[in-house]
């Protein structure tokens, strides 16, 4: 078995001494070249992973039910006779069962119908007649429906309002039962729905449940609400359609680098409902396709598992990357290699749902490991054992046919869970040396909006990603631009990097009839800032891209593809990149 040796990191002013070898030892310049290769490879892997996560967020299933919106307060006209009303009452009739009456009680610590009582208080002190009472009853019912309480009713009991009090009867709509349309369905609605029998029926809770049941790609769900014989009670009937519970996807693309293999093959297996909890398990592997070339190569593995519980979703994830390449050193050509592993856990929760908005939050904890080698000799300064915590807010908003997805997060490297200290010695000014214990703010924004020109449909898609850190970072944590995942039009062999920066991608898509194909054209811009940029010839990139996306479906599976060509529009003169970058991805799914 071959034993790897460690190469200690010394100051640049110190000579590097190694035990005797049959061939010349790597120099400090060789070590620096290997470090750059390792950092570049790690950035490429991280860019691809982040792009896939953002795409998954944008493409996540959404369930939206249409209910009347709560309009402005209606105006009461002058009428005779009318009576001044100083007090409004919104109470549950005493004739209803105790369980239903408790759900509408105004004495609850969190009165779910407090908004309705506040709505009525807007009319306190006004003179109200028969027509005014009808207007208020309709308006308060509209307000209740707009909040998702679609089976809750507001009625006007017989009364005399001459005493200055106007009473309304609130009949809370509750869930008697949740069941599947097919009684033999093997599935769990409890892991998906945040509500239970006996709870007040709110359409937003039901939307969340159906959305969670749609997470497995092989599963589609729908629901209907059926009234029962009892006042205020309804049954929720869930219809479930399923295809095969597994998905096998194979793809080929040219997203790699020349040093470790441009052509990359990917194979992934998805398992839906392995535990019957609307959970999803995904396993994958990737490998360069230059099997006969022993001088370069890369491969990796990835996996994830997620399970919902009402408004909560828990996830486990991990991915690895290994590469090797030949680098021409000062005295010899040597093999530079490296590996990286990332694993983490994420807990997300929906905080609020409405007809046009879903607000959420998440907390993520991850571990990151890595090492770099020259001819099987480890470069200790490149060894990583980091712990990173991240907390963020997410939001999905709809404006007409447009969809907006956004994330604002805070990320920080911490010292727990065995994380090793920074490899650099302390200095009087810690911000002048790179650190893995950084503080960082991250922003993601995506807008997808349809429009038409002369009856030809188009879609405009814009994506903005940015990060800000007051610290000096190692290259693996820098924002880099100049690849198919950031600013398109560049081949990704050289990229600009900085502690702070952003890139803005813009794309117009034109579907080709009903062929499931679309042409697209885009212009992207990116810029980096920070201490690291002092050594760059420039900090801005502009690139353009045109391409074709499409797919072919069959009863056995499907084939999807993308072909594109990009070119730089602006770059630093010293930056080397292809005049035209051609890219493709072909994916087959069973």
Model features per residue range: what roles?
Residues 23, 120, 426-590:
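C-terminal transmembrane beta-barrel domains of outer membrane proteins
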Residues 23-256, 262, 268, 285-299, ...:
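Periplasmic polypeptide-binding modules associated with outer-membrane biogenesis and secretion
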Residues 130, 199-200, 254-260, 290-294, ...:
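Outer-membrane beta-barrel domain signature
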Residues 211, 237, 268-270, 302-304, ...:
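Outer-membrane beta-barrel architecture
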Residues 225, 250-254, 267, 281-287, ...:
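Transmembrane beta-barrel strands of outer-membrane/channel proteins
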Residues 232, 261-265, 297-301, 339-343, ...:
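Residues that define the transmembrane beta-barrel architecture of outer-membrane proteins
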Residues 246-248, 275-281, 310-316, 354-359, ...:
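Repeated loop/turn-to-beta-strand initiation elements of outer-membrane beta-barrel proteins
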Residues 308, 313-473, 531:
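Transmembrane beta-strand segments of outer-membrane beta-barrel domains in Gram-negative
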């Amino acid at each position: 078995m071959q034993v790897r040796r460690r190469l200690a990191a010394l100051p640049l002013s110190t000579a590097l001494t190694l035990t005797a070898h049959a061939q010349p030892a790597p120099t400090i310049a060789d070590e620096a070249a290997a470090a750059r290769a390792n950092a570049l490879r790690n950035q490429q892997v991280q860019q691809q992973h982040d792009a896939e996560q953002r795409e998954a967020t944008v493409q996540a299933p959404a369930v939206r039910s249409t209910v009347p919106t709560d309009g402005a307060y209606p105006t009461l006209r002058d009428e005779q006779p009318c009576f001044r009303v100083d007090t409004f009452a919104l109470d549950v009739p005493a004739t209803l069962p105790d369980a239903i009456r408790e759900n509408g009680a105004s004495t609850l610590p969190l009165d779910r119908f407090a908004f309705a009582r506040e709505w009525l208080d807007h009319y306190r002190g006004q003179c109200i007649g028969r027509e005014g009472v009808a207007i208020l009853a309709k308006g308060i019912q509209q307000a209740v429906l707009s909040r998702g309480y679609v089976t809750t009713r507001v009625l006007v009991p017989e009364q005399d309002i001459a005493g200055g009090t106007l009473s309304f009867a609130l009949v809370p709509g509750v869930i008697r039962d949740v069941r599947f349309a097919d009684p033999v369905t093997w599935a769990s609605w409890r892991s998906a729905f945040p509500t239970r029998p006996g709870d007040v029926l709110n359409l937003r809770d039901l939307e969340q449940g159906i959305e969670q049941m749609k997470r497995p790609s092989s599963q589609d769900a729908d629901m209907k609400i059926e009234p029962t014989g009892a006042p205020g009670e309804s049954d929720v009937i869930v219809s479930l359609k399923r295809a095969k519970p597994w998905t096998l996807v194979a793809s080929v693309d040219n997203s790699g680098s020349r040093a470790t293999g441009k052509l990359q093959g990917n194979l992934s297996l998805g398992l839906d409902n392995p535990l019957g909890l609307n959970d999803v398990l995904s396993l994958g592997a990737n490998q360069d396709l230059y099997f006969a070339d022993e001088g370069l190569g890369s491969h990796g593995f990835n996996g994830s598992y997620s399970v919902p519980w009402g408004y909560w979703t828990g996830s486990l994830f991990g991915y690895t990357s290994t590469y090797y390449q030949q680098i021409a050193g000062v005295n010899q050509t040597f093999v530079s290699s490296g590996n990286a592993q990332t694993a983490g856990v994420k807990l997300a929760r929906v905080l609020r749902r409405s007809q046009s908005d879903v607000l959420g939050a998440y907390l993520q904890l991850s571990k990151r490991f890595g090492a770099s080698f020259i001819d099987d000799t480890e470069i200790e300064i490149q060894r990583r054992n980091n712990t990173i915590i991240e907390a963020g807010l997410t939001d999905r908003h709809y404006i007409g046919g447009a969809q907006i997805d956004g994330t604002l997060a805070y990320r920080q490297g911490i010292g727990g869970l065995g994380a090793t200290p920074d490899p650099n010695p302390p200095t009087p000014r810690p911000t002048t040396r790179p650190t893995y214990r950084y503080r960082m703010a991250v922003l993601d924004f995506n807008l997808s909006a349809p429009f038409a020109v002369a009856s030809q449909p188009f879609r405009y898609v814009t994506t903005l990603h940015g990060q800000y850190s007051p610290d000096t970072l190692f290259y693996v944590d820098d924002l880099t631009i100049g690849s198919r995942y950031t600013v398109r039009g560049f081949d990704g062999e050289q990229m600009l990097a900085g502690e702070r920066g952003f890139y803005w991608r813009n794309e117009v898509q034109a579907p080709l009839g009903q062929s499931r194909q679309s042409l697209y054209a885009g212009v992207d811009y990116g810029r980096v800032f920070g201490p690291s940029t002092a050594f760059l010839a420039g900090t801005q990139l502009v690139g353009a891209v045109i391409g074709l996306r499409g797919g072919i479906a069959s009863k056995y599976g499907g084939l999807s593809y993308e072909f594109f060509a990009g070119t730089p529009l602006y770059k630093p003169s010293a930056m080397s990149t292809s005049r035209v970058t051609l890219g493709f991805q072909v994916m087959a799914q069973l």
